[in-house]
Amino acid sequence: MADGTPFARRAGTIRHNGFVHAAAMSFDLHVPESRSLKAKRAAIRPIVDGLRHRFRVSVAETDHHDQWQRAEIAVAIVAESDGRVQTLLDGVERFVAAAPAIELLGTETAWLESE
């Protein structure tokens, strides 16, 4: 493009019936076998990478950065419908709960309401 932004043609918000369909989910995790921050990150990294690759969602470690056995990760999802967002949230939660090196202590979900 003339203004130097290569993605200007594709830029935009996914909308259906005037609404943006998006949600965020956070996971409070316990890493019982961790004895160092390095060990904790080694246990969390496959979860974060797996979520990105399998579900194509945005994910980050968001809390407990300095604690050896605690972690919080958050996932953000934008999709074409609330149903699709819910399906992805369900899959993401199952994926995290099945991770062998962690215990899932709790989850919290927030939906974006926008028109």
Q: Which residues does each predicted region cover?
A:
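N-terminal amphipathic/hydrophobic targeting modules at extreme N-termini
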Residues: 2-5, 10-15
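N-terminal first-folded block
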Residues: 14-58, 95, 99
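A generic structural signal for well-ordered coil/turn residues at beta-strand boundaries
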Residues: 21-23, 71, 103
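A structural signal for short, well-ordered beta-strand segments
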Residues: 25-29, 73-75, 107-109
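A general secondary-structure boundary signal
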Residues: 28, 62-64, 91
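Short, charge-patterned binding micro-sites
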Residues: 59-81
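C-terminal structural segments of small proteins and small subunits
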Residues: 78-115
